[in-house]
Amino acid sequence: MLLPYNEWRHVFKLDPAKEIEEAALQAIATSGTDAIIVGGTDDITLDATLDLLMRLRRYPVAVALEVSELEAATMGFDAYLTPSVLNSGTLEHVIDKQVEALEEVGHMLAHQDLVGEGYIVLNADAKVARVTQAKLLNDDQVVAYAQLADSVFRMPIIYLEYSGMYGDPSLVASVKRVLKQGRLFYGGGIDSIERAQEMLTHADTIVVGNIIYDNLEAALATVAATR
């Protein structure tokens, strides 16, 4: 049985713009992870997204699409995650791109599991920070953004995105304490079971991505943190 997003504890994230061999893909899909998110920051095409989806459909694992590029939106996923970068310096990445996408493909997704993500980007050196012109935040501001996303906007997912850098566990814990209904996702720098375990003591869900392409065995080891 495929788990819904609000029961995920461990998730792998695959970038359609990056190559992954079939043996590695099989290892990821059969690792015991709760789900696989398909998404990336740039060079995301429909062909690459469809190819990755078709390859993943051979395995009994939930597959979600992060709808960050209109061109890559397609049917066939178990869930559709719609990211709004709350600390973006431009409305384009808070609401404009999302509205544009739903204008074009919203009719196709009307009966699908469409889930909003309130992204807070916390690594100023990451590509996603540059693309979205993310504003630098202090700890109090991070907590306030998360509380706004949770209690006012009622977003089902609040996502702390460190994108390649390991974040501050105490800040993740502070964010978790103010959430009333949203699920806290954490992504960034999880490259060992120890880091996975540490972040899972605070976040509801950890997202493991970059390490897949650098050290597959280390990535696979993180799944055991949920046991």
From Swiss-Prot:
InterPro entries in the record, alphabetically? Answer: GGGP/HepGP_synthase_I (IPR039074), GGGP/HepGP_synthase_sf (IPR038597), GGGP_HepGP_synthase (IPR008205)
As its record notes, the protein acts as a catalyst of: sn-glycerol 1-phosphate + all-trans-heptaprenyl diphosphate = 3-heptaprenyl-sn-glycero-1-phosphate + diphosphate
Q: Name one GO molecular function term.
A: magnesium ion binding
Protein keywords? Lipid biosynthesis, Lipid metabolism, Magnesium, Metal-binding, Phospholipid biosynthesis, Phospholipid metabolism, Transferase
Q: Which residues bind sn-glycerol 1-phosphate?
A: K13, Y159, L160, E161, Y162, S163, G164, G189, G209, N210
Per UniProt, Mg(2+) binds at D15, T41
Listed EC numbers: 2.5.1.n9
Cofactor(s) needed for function:
Mg(2+)
Quick one: which pathway? Membrane lipid metabolism; glycerophospholipid metabolism
Report the sequence similarity comment from the record.
Answer: Belongs to the GGGP/HepGP synthase family. Group I subfamily.
- Oligomer and partners: Homodimer.
Which purpose does this protein serve, as stated in its record? Prenyltransferase that catalyzes in vivo the transfer of the heptaprenyl moiety of heptaprenyl pyrophosphate (HepPP; 35 carbon atoms) to the C3 hydroxyl of sn-glycerol-1-phosphate (G1P), producing heptaprenylglyceryl phosphate (HepGP). This reaction is an ether-bond-formation step in the biosynthesis of archaea-type G1P-based membrane lipids found in Bacillales.
| Protein name per the record | Heptaprenylglyceryl phosphate synthase
Q: Which organism is it from?
A: Exiguobacterium sibiricum (strain DSM 17290 / CCUG 55495 / CIP 109462 / JCM 13490 / 255-15)
**Organism classification, top ranks?**
Bacteria, Bacillati, Bacillota, Bacilli, Bacillales
